[in-house]
Amino acid sequence: MSVKVDGMINKKSKTHSKKLDARALAEKIKKNALKQQAQEEPAKEENVAENFDTVVDPTAELKFKSFNELKLIPELLEAIQQMKFTKPTPIQSEAIPHALEGKDIIGLAQTGSGKTAAFAIPILQALWEAQAAYYGLVLAPTRELAYQIKETFDALGSSMGLRSVCIVGGMDMMDQARDLMRKPHILVATPGRIMDHLEHTKGFSLKNLKYLVMDEADRLLDMDFGPALDKILKIIPTQRTTYLFSATMTNKIAKLQRASLHNPVRVAVSNKYQTADNLVQSMMLVSDGYKNTYLIHLLNEFLGKSIIIFTRTCAHSQRTALLARILGFSAVPLHGQLTQAQRLGSLNKFKAGKANILIATDVAARGLDIPSVDIVINYDIPTDSKAYIHRVGRTARAGKSGKSISLITQYDLEMYLRIESVLGKKLPKDPSPSKAVLDTLHVHVDRASAEAIRQTKDFHEKRNPKKNRDDRDREER
């Protein structure tokens, strides 16, 4: 027997003779969530207050309003104009003048803030005079972000004869060694793979390195790159300029700052828990057994829109992408169990509009330049509030409007309430489709789900991953 409760379809429990008091349960969950949040947040806020001397209001007057004011070389200004950088972002306005003076920088800035150009422009300006090999090393937590950073350097250095290389896991070591022997100016790398080359590639050394950048340092540490970072810091020269950028400030980041930077200028230009004003956020209560059905219903509702669907695991990403394809949607997966070529293929198809649905783990939540995303759907709600902020931040960018929808089951209520607490507001509930619509759609979805599960099993059986340091630059699942 089924009953419909507030948009959710559930089977009556046979093991409980009394009805649960839903309101009391919700209040208990909320109380526990708020208590836990209160215990966690003061420490985080204290870290930010302690480690950041300069907190900049993003709406404050910019230190410079045009890149022409910076006395950059003509070749760099030409590239900036070609990239249509009309005015600096707040992080660029704060960081670039100090960086051009040769100071170390530590910046608290979110994805999409323009921080890549904030460190690339000063490095390229200095490189013009030096023209030295292995001049700058940029460390990134993920392969996709590393490739994206390289693209920015290449675009800004297009008139300078810049040589850059991307050194990440999942690619052939010998090919990369040959690239390194061509004496590139800029290296963009994941820590595990660049450490492999420092240890095993004959003739490769960073003894003359002048610039070190650690981008998204919080993720570098979250993904267990700490030991590799320690080794790299011991190998490279102490007389260098260092930039450290992070979305959040923690004790680990503060420790890394003390170990790697010298009298840095500290700048924060973002609110950790801020979402864009032009982002419409909502949730939809769903039955766990009907989750795929609700998702396909939403894809039908937003047919033709550019959509990112976030899942918690690689398996969910792969299976959900297959499900969507079987039902006629143009969807591609993006997760850490794909090869590097497959991941770049999925990303490029989505960015080019050849596929309008990207189904990803949190690898796509930060750092990647994915323009014009209309809708973000949290198929699996994230396990922490920061991840939620980063996910929904993939839409409503550059002044455009956007929408995010989170599918919430009865098992997600505690985490959902914690997210609402951090946001400081309740998310409106979207209406559910009628039971008749769901039941009709569920028949087709159920059949397609069985086929998607079979194909996912085949995908995993064909995989034969190498278990070495190459895989330490895997993505968050």
From Swiss-Prot:
<dbReference type="InterPro" id="IPR011545">
    <property type="entry name" value="DEAD/DEAH_box_helicase_dom"/>
</dbReference>
<dbReference type="Pfam" id="PF00271">
    <property type="entry name" value="Helicase_C"/>
</dbReference>
<comment type="similarity">
    <text>Belongs to the DEAD box helicase family. DDX47/RRP3 subfamily.</text>
</comment>
<dbReference type="GO" id="GO:0003723">
    <property type="term" value="F:RNA binding"/>
</dbReference>
<dbReference type="InterPro" id="IPR014014">
    <property type="entry name" value="RNA_helicase_DEAD_Q_motif"/>
</dbReference>
<feature type="region of interest" description="Disordered">
    <location>
        <begin position="452"/>
        <end position="477"/>
    </location>
</feature>
<dbReference type="GO" id="GO:0005730">
    <property type="term" value="C:nucleolus"/>
</dbReference>
<protein>
    <recommendedName>
        <fullName>ATP-dependent rRNA helicase RRP3</fullName>
        <ecNumber>3.6.4.13</ecNumber>
    </recommendedName>
</protein>
<dbReference type="GO" id="GO:0005524">
    <property type="term" value="F:ATP binding"/>
</dbReference>
<dbReference type="GO" id="GO:0032040">
    <property type="term" value="C:small-subunit processome"/>
</dbReference>
<comment type="subunit">
    <text>Interacts with the SSU processome.</text>
</comment>
<comment type="function">
    <text>ATP-dependent rRNA helicase required for pre-ribosomal RNA processing. Involved in the maturation of the 35S-pre-rRNA and to its cleavage to mature 18S rRNA.</text>
</comment>
<dbReference type="InterPro" id="IPR027417">
    <property type="entry name" value="P-loop_NTPase"/>
</dbReference>
<dbReference type="GO" id="GO:0005829">
    <property type="term" value="C:cytosol"/>
</dbReference>
<dbReference type="GO" id="GO:0016887">
    <property type="term" value="F:ATP hydrolysis activity"/>
</dbReference>
<keyword id="KW-0067">ATP-binding</keyword>
<dbReference type="InterPro" id="IPR001650">
    <property type="entry name" value="Helicase_C-like"/>
</dbReference>
<keyword id="KW-0378">Hydrolase</keyword>
<dbReference type="InterPro" id="IPR044765">
    <property type="entry name" value="DDX47/Rrp3_DEADc"/>
</dbReference>
<keyword id="KW-0539">Nucleus</keyword>
<dbReference type="Pfam" id="PF00270">
    <property type="entry name" value="DEAD"/>
</dbReference>
<feature type="short sequence motif" description="Q motif">
    <location>
        <begin position="65"/>
        <end position="93"/>
    </location>
</feature>
<feature type="domain" description="Helicase ATP-binding">
    <location>
        <begin position="96"/>
        <end position="267"/>
    </location>
</feature>
<keyword id="KW-0547">Nucleotide-binding</keyword>
<feature type="short sequence motif" description="DEAD box">
    <location>
        <begin position="215"/>
        <end position="218"/>
    </location>
</feature>
<keyword id="KW-0698">rRNA processing</keyword>
<dbReference type="InterPro" id="IPR000629">
    <property type="entry name" value="RNA-helicase_DEAD-box_CS"/>
</dbReference>
<dbReference type="InterPro" id="IPR014001">
    <property type="entry name" value="Helicase_ATP-bd"/>
</dbReference>
<dbReference type="InterPro" id="IPR050079">
    <property type="entry name" value="DEAD_box_RNA_helicase"/>
</dbReference>
<keyword id="KW-0690">Ribosome biogenesis</keyword>
<feature type="binding site">
    <location>
        <begin position="109"/>
        <end position="116"/>
    </location>
    <ligand>
        <name>ATP</name>
    </ligand>
</feature>
<feature type="domain" description="Helicase C-terminal">
    <location>
        <begin position="294"/>
        <end position="438"/>
    </location>
</feature>
<keyword id="KW-0347">Helicase</keyword>
<keyword id="KW-0694">RNA-binding</keyword>
<dbReference type="GO" id="GO:0003724">
    <property type="term" value="F:RNA helicase activity"/>
</dbReference>
<dbReference type="GO" id="GO:0000462">
    <property type="term" value="P:maturation of SSU-rRNA from tricistronic rRNA transcript (SSU-rRNA, 5.8S rRNA, LSU-rRNA)"/>
</dbReference>
<feature type="region of interest" description="Disordered">
    <location>
        <begin position="1"/>
        <end position="22"/>
    </location>
</feature>
